[in-house]
């Protein structure tokens, strides 16, 4: 897949700065004034004069024939550089990309390209090598462009694509493809960082490519790429990808932790397929949050994602319990106030959270923290969720940041990433 970049390096030099300085060979005095000081062979000068004259007359076939003659007579790097310079200007007039690539290679390989042009020339040569699937040359030229100080945001994507080209698309989790992918991701990250430093917006597609490549190569930084993809384009689908990667990397999280992860999908429109809704309902059912079982299945049915039978067993089990459960909450609040620890308050807060009564949930979670004897990280996570859903993003962020350790801290980090898209 080609990257979408702000400026295509495949543009002709005529569009990015014009022709290079090349004398007309009318006199040796003129020759010494322009570009590097060269000692060009007389036979080469004669052929290049013919090439320039033909190009000025728009006779590009004749110009190319004269350039071929010059090539056959070249004896030194001075000759090769000057032939390349005339060849480059001819390629611009003829709109001949192949000739342009040949010219750039000739000039760069001569070792005489002026420093102020070396970066741009190497960058364009790198892109042309990439188009030709000469990945090693593309990397070599691209790295030379970066070393010459050329725009990293323009060159690093070419280097990244070349490494991805070397990695291929099959068996990318094995070496050497895995290593090439890692190098490509390093270049892609450098490109994104350079674009940000230049005040430009990084194409969201870059992060999606990063996720796909890291996932295919089974690299541990796939989660970091998914997080960057979500921050660049905070859609429910991108957050869903991030959540699913977290779940896969943490297969032993508890049902209660998993419920809080799935709540994030619910809050962000990240519930997409039937399995998302039924998994959420199942986790709520296993932890006795009956109101949430009903609400998530109702939501899936309203969206047309769940049919009448999907999750029906969970639904039919939970709904009859709701009235009695709600009716007991008042006395549970009173008991929580009198209890020696925060366990009753925490359970009551869980129920209120499931029924969407966020104000009472927040009050009970605060009470549970005050009384103690509970899992502080879980309480802070759920307090953050309640505050998020109540619209208190600053308070929610503070609660999530109070989560200290383990997979709970990672769950809180996912919620913080979500809040970051809300201006928190």
Where are these predicted regions, by residue range?
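Structural motif corresponding to the intra-repeat A-B loop/turn of tetratricopeptide repeats
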Residues: 57, 94, 132, 166-167, ...
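Long, contiguous interaction/recruitment modules in multidomain scaffold/adaptor proteins
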Residues: 3-7, 16-38, 253-257, 270-327
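Flexible, glycine-rich surface segments
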Residues: 296, 300-303, 309, 313, ...
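N-terminal leader/linker segments that initiate helical-solenoid repeat arrays
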Residues: 2-106, 110-120, 124, 131, ...
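C-terminal soluble interaction/assembly domains
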Residues: 341-424
């Amino acid at each position: 897949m080609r990257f979408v970049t702000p400026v295509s390096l495949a543009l002709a030099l005529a569009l990015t700065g014009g022709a290079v300085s090349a004398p007309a060979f009318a006199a040796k005095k003129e020759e010494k004034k322009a570009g590097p000081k060269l000692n060009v062979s007389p036979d080469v000068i004669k052929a290049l004069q013919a090439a320039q004259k033909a190009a000025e007359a728009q006779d590009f076939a004749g110009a190319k024939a004269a350039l071929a003659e010059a090539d056959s007579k070249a004896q030194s790097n001075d000759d090769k550089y000057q032939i390349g310079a005339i060849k480059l200007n001819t390629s611009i007039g003829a709109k001949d990309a192949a000739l342009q690539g040949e010219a750039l290679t000739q000039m760069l390989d001569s070792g005489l390209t002026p420093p102020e042009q070396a970066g741009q020339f190497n960058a364009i040569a790198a892109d042309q090598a990439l188009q030709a699937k000469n990945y090693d040359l593309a990397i070599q030229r691209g790295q030379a462009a970066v070393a010459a100080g050329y725009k990293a945001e323009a060159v690093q994507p070419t280097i990244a694509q070349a490494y991805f080209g070397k990695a291929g698309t099959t068996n990318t989790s094995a070496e050497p493809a895995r290593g090439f992918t890692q190098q490509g991701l390093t270049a892609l990250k450098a490109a994104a960082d350079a674009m940000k430093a230049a005040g430009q917006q990084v194409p969201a597609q870059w992060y999606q490519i990063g996720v796909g490549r890291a996932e295919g190569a089974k690299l541990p930084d796939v989660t970091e790429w998914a997080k960057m993809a979500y921050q660049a384009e905070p859609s429910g689908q991108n957050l869903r990808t991030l959540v699913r990667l977290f779940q896969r990397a943490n297969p032993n999280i508890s049902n209660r932790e998993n419920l809080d992860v799935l709540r994030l999908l619910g809050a962000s429109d990240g519930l997409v397929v039937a399995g998302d809704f039924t998994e959420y309902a199942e986790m709520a059912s296993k932890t006795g949050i009956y109101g949430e079982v009903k609400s998530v299945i109702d939501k899936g049915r309203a969206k047309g994602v769940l049919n009448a039978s999907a999750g029906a067993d969970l639904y039919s089990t939970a709904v009859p319990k709701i009235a009695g459960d709600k009716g007991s909450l008042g006395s549970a609040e009173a008991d929580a106030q009198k209890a020696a620890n925060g366990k009753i308050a925490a359970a009551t807060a869980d129920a209120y959270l499931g029924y969407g009564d966020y104000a009472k949930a927040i009050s009970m979670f605060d009470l549970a923290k005050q009384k103690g004897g509970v899992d502080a990280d879980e309480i802070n996570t759920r307090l953050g969720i309640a505050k998020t859903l109540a619209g208190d993003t600053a308070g929610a962020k503070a609660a999530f940041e109070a989560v200290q350790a383990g997979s709970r801290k990672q769950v809180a980090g996912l919620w913080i990433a979500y809040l970051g898209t809300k201006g928190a």
